[in-house]
Amino acid sequence: MQLVLIRFFLIFLLIWFFFSFFVSPSGHYFQYQEFTAELVAKLLNAMGEDHLWLYHGEYKTEIYARDGAHISVAGSGGQYPYMFFIAAVMAWPGGWLRRSAMLIAGLALLFSASVLTVLGAYMIDVYHPVQFDLFKKYIAPTALVSLVIVLFFTWTVISGAKPDFGESPVKPL
């Protein structure tokens, strides 16, 4: 079990380092945020919501409502739940085919949840602005982390593998 935890932390640190020093400074992450905002804008169009989507260069994308409410997509990407999920799945033992399928399916679900989180934040800011901070600071992050935990537990079942715990220090009677 300790080996799994060490692998998890090492993989997480590698992913965090790669994201912080290569992906984020290169501007590719902002393309992801722009794509997320564009999807939210399309969902708002499909729902018949009146809004204005503004792209302010590579650092900020905002969606405005008619009453002045707005959502900034910068910082709403949910990159840490992605990192935790990838590290957890990579650290737990299992076959590469199942692992690849789980990573693809899990990342797709996390992306969908991230888009719904931004959409939900917009709708709450428009219709229940008093509850916006509660949703943005507590409910949305808790929902994303809970999804990561459920996906990881699903992976532990699907993988069909268990880490080697070694010999138990407790002897049976």
Where are these regions (language model features)?
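Hydrophobic N-terminal alpha-helices or hydrophobic patches in metabolic proteins across all domains
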Residues: M1-L173
